[in-house]
Amino acid sequence: VKSAKPDVTVLALVGTDHHPFDRMVNLVDELLAGHDPSDGALSCLIQFGTAQAPSSAQGRDFLAKDEVKEHIDRADLVLCHGGPSTIVEILRSGKMPLVMPRDPERGEHVDGHQQRFARHMAGLGLIQLVDSVQQVRAEVEQFTAGADERLNPGIELPSPAESALRLGRIVDRLTAAAPAQRWWRRGGRRR
């Protein structure tokens, strides 16, 4: 007797940037539209920001920080933009983020920092880069097949407070080592 496939909850986060990220909204809608119910139930919540509202998925334009954390903890899979803060929050939850970085060539951001950061994190094995509904569908299928151990990178990150203290110590060392120079003249003009 074959056991029923588990229900899967996907959370998608476009972040708070003012550029619309319709590509992610469309991907999530396409994922739901193409889902076979015999593969188990699939529910998706997308925080869509300034993008168009989803037509198939449940959507909220913005979520408070505590709501984001709650939804990340409840979700089986989390798809997100390439923002470092969001990625780290998902990693802290013990999940491997499925990351679809915003593309400035498509008007989704001002520069390519999300793409560069996401490639770096993928190279470290900490995230899974995705760019198509087929890739996300494959992640859902792997999860329902029980291959979810791959989705937890098993890393421990310092708390935000500990990270801030570490950064403060680094800044203190750098400023202590810098020569005492005056880079400006009185009146605010550079020489």
Please tell me what each predicted stretch does.
Residues 1-74:
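Donor-nucleotide binding loops and adjacent catalytic segments primarily
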Residues 19, 62-70, 81, 108, ...:
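Residues at secondary-structure transition points
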Residues 24, 111-117, 149-151:
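Class I S-adenosyl-L-methionine-dependent methyltransferase catalytic core
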Residues 42, 138, 142-191:
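C-terminal amphipathic helix plus adjacent low-complexity
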Residues 59-63, 127-136:
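Short acidic-hydrophobic, aromatic-tinged amphipathic segments that line or gate anion-handling sites
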Residues 66-67, 86, 135-139:
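Short acidic active-site motifs
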Residues 68-110:
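A donor-sugar binding/catalytic signature common to diverse glycosyltransferases
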Residues 96-131:
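Catalytic binding pocket for nucleotide-activated donors in carbohydrate/polymer assembly enzymes
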